[in-house]
Amino acid sequence: MFKAVLFDLDGVITDTAEYHFRAWKALAEEIGINGVDRQFNEQLKGVSREDSLQKILDLADKKVSAEEFKELAKRKNDNYVKMIQDVSPADVYPGILQLLKDLRSNKIKIALASASKNGPFLLEKMNLTGYFDAIADPAEVAASKPAPDIFIAAAHAVGVAPSESIGLEDSQAGIQAIKDSGALPIGVGRPEDLGDDIVIVPDTSYYTLEFLKEVWLQKQK
């Protein structure tokens, strides 16, 4: 039986992914870069702020100084933070609150493994902080997703090996990170975006404790 569930935040617990997309698109247009559409945005999901900005700059072969890079990253985040001020418990995705309750009542550890530095703020806005045993700090890991560092850190933060954990993700980068950490990925989204070699559910209402147990047992066979 698995001992921990490691949650991504954007696109798994709530739809802050949409706010990230709008904030990146606005920033790109401000600096004269076109092409940050929904298709390109798939590359940014689950990726750190700095790595996302670099991908956008690379799109137009644009070079900026270290100081300007820092300012652009801050500008995007300031815009994003304004957008998420109104996030509330009503924004929690279907099934997630019940899953958190069931995991706690079954003494299964819960950790956040998000690239978002705003993770603690968002959990607080949605009244979910108390369900989490640990929040891995993205600023403390050496490499962002698709590197496995954040999932390894999240598992270790609750005293569990990644191989004894399930990771929940909605992005290609995140799924790769879970695989490389040694945890078992269960994706939410479309197989054409996430790959056909893992279990994928169409929406978060499928994330029940019973379903997670089922997938875990199948993978152990």
Swiss-Prot record:
Coiled coil: none
Effect of K76A: 100-fold reduction in the conversion of beta-G1P to G6P in the presence of beta-G1,6bisP
Active-site feature positions: D8 (nucleophile), D10 (proton donor/acceptor)
pH dependence: Optimum pH is around 7. Relatively stable in solution within the pH range of 5-9.5.
Induction per the UniProt record: By maltose, trehalose and sucrose and repressed by glucose and lactose.
GO biological-process terms attached to the record: carbohydrate metabolic process
UniProt GO MF annotations: beta-phosphoglucomutase activity; magnesium ion binding
InterPro entries for the chain: B-phosphoglucomutase_hydrolase (IPR010976), Beta-PGM (IPR010972), Beta-PGM-like (IPR051600), HAD-like_sf (IPR036412), HAD-SF_hydro_IA (IPR006439), HAD_sf (IPR023214), PGP-like_dom2 (IPR023198)
Required cofactor names: Mg(2+)
Mutation effect (G46V): 10'000-fold decrease in catalytic efficiency
Effect of G46A: 1'000'000-fold decrease in catalytic efficiency
Effect of S52A: Wild-type activity
Top-level EC class: isomerase
Regulation of its function: Activated by phosphorylation. Competitively inhibited by alpha-D-galactose-1-phosphate.
PTM statement from Swiss-Prot or TrEMBL: Autophosphorylated.
Function statement: Catalyzes the interconversion of D-glucose 1-phosphate (G1P) and D-glucose 6-phosphate (G6P), forming beta-D-glucose 1,6-(bis)phosphate (beta-G16P) as an intermediate. The beta-phosphoglucomutase (Beta-PGM) acts on the beta-C(1) anomer of G1P. Glucose or lactose are used in preference to maltose, which is only utilized after glucose or lactose has been exhausted. It plays a key role in the regulation of the flow of carbohydrate intermediates in glycolysis and the formation of the sugar nucleotide UDP-glucose.
Protein name: Beta-phosphoglucomutase
The species this protein was found in: Lactococcus lactis subsp. lactis (strain IL1403) (Streptococcus lactis)
